[in-house]
Amino acid sequence: MRKVKSKKSNYLLLFCGALLVLILVVLITDTKGEKNGYSEQCVYRNEIPSLLQFTYYSRDEWAEKLPQQGTLTYDDVSGILELLHLKEYIPLDDSEKNIDRAAWFAIYDEILSYLDTDTSVLKKDILVLKKEKKQLTTQDGTYAITSNPKWYQKLHSYGVYLLEDKVIGVAAKDKEDVALKNAYLISNIEGNLTFLYQGTEYQLPVDTDEELSNVVADISFSEKEIHKISRKEDTITGKLISKTDTAMEIKGYGQVAIDEAMKIYATYDGIREVSMDALMLENMEITFVVAEKQICAILLTEPAKIENIRVLLLDNDNMFRSDVSLVSDVPVHLYYGETETVLEAGSMITASNYANILATSSVSLVAEDGISPFYFTDNQGNRISPAYAGSMELRMYPEGYTVVNVVDLESYVKGVIPSEVPSSYGMEALKAQAVCARSYAYIQMMHNKYEAYGAHVDDSVNFQVYNKQNQTPETVAAVDETKGQVLSYKGDIIETYYYSTSYGHTGDYEAWNLDKDAYGYLQGVWVRSEENPIDLSDEKSFLDYISNVDSACYESDLKYFRWNTVLDFQGKDETLLHTIADRKEHQPEAICYYKDASKTETTDSCSNFGSLQAINVVKRNQSGVILELELDFQNGAVSVQSEYNMRAILGCGITNINLLDGSSVEMSILPSAYISIQAKGDGTYAVLGGGYGHGIGMSQNGAQKLCGQGFDYKRILNYFYQDTELTELYQPQNTTKEEGGA
């Protein structure tokens, strides 16, 4: 007779089976949990090497010292503290075998307080926006991850530890609310919020039907859901006139601090997040979104409209002045912040008299009629400068006062042309120079090099010489007849490099290690009546060429076409090494120190290299310019690239340059890097060279000679800048570059 099991027995068996499965799951989770996911109840041993790599031992060394399987125990932690010599400083509660995540990271924080004296490990709450293999995109940037990628889920928050650009540990999950600061809200349609953040558009459900469009806001998340939206609707509209890392100066308003999480959005031709490079001083009407007295976002509602350039006026190559006085023949309106004062015509305006105001604000000086110029004066009011069109701005810094001339671009170019070339050069050469000056100025306005001082450029050879010579009818006409014309290559306005005199051939983009795609218009060309088949990259061929005057070259009658000098570094070792170190500070990638002439091992300093033993040309390109120069010393060697570095360094050894016309001139820098160097056997070096300037782009004297050959300005420009075209500047210029998407 078959026995029938009772229902009670079946239930008992099912219960026992379920309990067994549960126990197995717990055991598996305890030993294999890292493969299945993040746990608050334990820390996995193989998390520890990444967390402790900032200490005396590397990540690999920690992996050897600690078992890497299973979960972390209090015994493990005790061993870690002993290895770190912290056991007597950090007490342990060893009541349980395994240590949970919160307890371990409390101990880890204490370890950091003792050992991480440089604060290299940072603690941060992140919100995961995107996960790709071993990389997380978060509200604050992109980080590599060392733990299991399965731990991280999109739109969840994590308390993490960061070392450089890596997440090295996870202390908690969904414990803190995290906000996307200064996101751009596009729309809220039927509870679906569309917003832009870090270059990526997101669409998420939101528990509200309120209007949320075209506004900047903080979006707070809690456990994967939006739980709060804080709109930021206070704005200031105006022009940006100076910018530092911490503040922006708005014309007619003053300085405003910058939120660390500030975003920039272009809202014309679609909505996109753009980089800081999109901002141009003076020439953009900008909407600044402000919250808690900080700029938290910038809205670019239209492209830049090029009107004015801001020129820092130097005082004998010094940007700072102990004091300065200006005057105009008409009443002057003086602006600072939102305040306006009118001064009588002829009033001497001295910066030190406004020191109290300048301590917190710039001061803008505007002629009442909008056209009368300003002049610098001495202490007695005597005029000591040419006339300056436009307005003036005064600022005060710990080093002294600065003066910025805000002037329309055409007036600026009119001030550049006579300062760069004589009006006798011929109209077509002057017009070519005007197009170059205008194009070059635009590029510098994009670069904003002097933005911290409220300027785009200065008035020296650092950029373009400005207002150092009086304008003439010819130079003014050259600017007027080319008004608004700039050179473009592949649709972009180009940087129109120019210089004084060629040696018969111009340089190309390779001389400065420039990108061929962007600077392909800088091709080396012969500046002579016909091509010459000589290979100028060959040392012997170059020496043969530079040793003679090539009469077929347009500039062969000019004194800088050929020159010679002697390099003598005896007694100048300290000066030479100091100059090398200075140039490396300015351009570190172009100069390299080696322990010896074999150049197999680098070193960080050249200060103990001793005296110079030899100079060698390592590489020369087809235009003839030296690409790499090697200087061998008693205790090391130096590799030098870039023509200006070579000219400055070798310039330490010269006194006079002997020119083609028989004259001699004192110089402290070589006229060009189109040179041949020959050791003389007595420790000195004979140098044969040609040309004056960097040699890249347009030769100004070459342009004059081409003008004399009947070339018009368009043909001159196409001669020196290959595959370019004239375009119109005074139309809206799109300066924006879209930020990389998440």
Question: Which stretches of residues belong to each language-model region?
Answer:
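The conserved cystathionine-beta-synthase
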Residues: 81-84, 101
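Conserved, single-site charged/polar hotspot
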Residues: 2-42, 46-47, 51, 56-67, ...
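Serine/threonine-rich, repeat-prone extracellular segments and beta-strand-based repeat modules
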Residues: 94-98
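Residues within well-ordered alpha-helices
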Residues: 77-80, 702
